[in-house]
Amino acid sequence: MDPYTVAIIKKLGIEEQVETAATKSPFIEGLANGTAPPGAFKRWLYEDRIYVQGCSLCLAKAINAITHEKGFPKEALDLFLGAYNVITPELAHFEARCKESNVEMPKLKPVPTSWEQALQDNKPEEYYHLSAPDCKSYIQFMTQELFEIPGTSGIDYFMAFYLNEVIYHRAWKFVRESKQFQKNCPEEMEFVKWWGQPSFGKFVENLARSIQDVPFTSATVDIAKKICNFEYRFFSTAFEKA
């Protein structure tokens, strides 16, 4: 991990939780050591597509909150705005790759092209029924419950999204570096190479650097721990049924 991310995780006191969420779930460990059952990866891709739909709304809500918060670092806001703007092209690449690999995808509306539109048109209740229980509960937290926690502010919403990215990148970098995975899973590697690429790691680093001087609260720590737990469980949707 980059030094900025290491510093934040240490400050939050969640070093062990992050590593467990990223590399200790049965799904990620199974991919890395060659014991994941057939079909698990494709099953997880289906759930991941649903989660991205929900996470885009979380990002839109976070942007909306941060834009109204005096003194929040402009660099952090700009990174969030950039993150929202790349969702559509990223999904186009992802869905094209899934089609090439005969991966079933859920029937979803396009992600709204602007975060302002997402606040109006992205309705998680329209796709809850498509998702596995742990995916649904994660989306509910990221799009609704997170923003209802008393006393929270922009740094808490930023942290929720940021840690999601940290764990995601750490997990797939871990899988990508596995010799067993490299040998046994050439088709899956095409997805994993995309997620583990250096540019994604740089994005995570930039997010961390942008909030180095923003103070955390006890709510920030609690939310960070919740995200670690949700991420660990979300990887297990590879073994669930919607």
Swiss-Prot record:
Compartment(s) where it occurs, according to its Swiss-Prot or TrEMBL record: Cytoplasm; Nucleus
GO cellular component, one term: cytosol
Stored InterPro entries: Haem_Oase-like_multi-hlx, Thiamine_Salvage_TenA
Keywords in alphabetical order: Cytoplasm, Nucleus
Gene3D superfamilies in alphabetical order: Heme oxygenase-like (1.20.910.10)
Single GO term (MF): catalytic activity
Coiled coil segments of this chain: none
SUPFAM superfamilies: Heme oxygenase-like
Name assigned to this protein: Uncharacterized protein C530.07c
